[in-house]
């Protein structure tokens, strides 16, 4: 009976450690995913002003050439 209790206690202890390691890994994966999302937003913030400035410079010239009213 004593060895059975020891074995069960050992299994419980190892299972608890394994479960806590899985939780830590899952938390790290979720944090990684959030970082990717934040990086996408950051790239988007840098990309939109660039496109807007290029359009602001290019569209008047294009309009002038099409209508020939410069």
From Swiss-Prot:
Where in or outside the cell it occurs: the entry states: Secreted
Q: Which family does it belong to?
A: Belongs to the frog skin active peptide (FSAP) family. Brevinin subfamily.
Taken from the UniProt entry, a GO cellular component term is: extracellular region
**S-S pairs:** 64-70
Is Disulfide bond tagged as a keyword?
yes
Q: Which organism is it from?
A: Amolops mantzorum (Sichuan torrent frog)
What is the name of this protein? Brevinin-1MT1
List GO BP terms, alphabetically: defense response to bacterium; defense response to fungus; innate immune response; killing of cells of another organism
């Amino acid at each position: 009976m004593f060895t059975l209790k020891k074995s069960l206690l050992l299994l419980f202890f190892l299972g608890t450690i394994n479960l806590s390691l899985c939780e830590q890994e899952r938390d790290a994966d979720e944090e990684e995913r959030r970082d990717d999302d934040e990086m996408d937003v950051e790239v988007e913030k840098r990309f939109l002003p660039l496109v807007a400035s290029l359009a602001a410079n290019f569209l008047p010239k294009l309009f002038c050439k099409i209508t020939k009213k410069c």
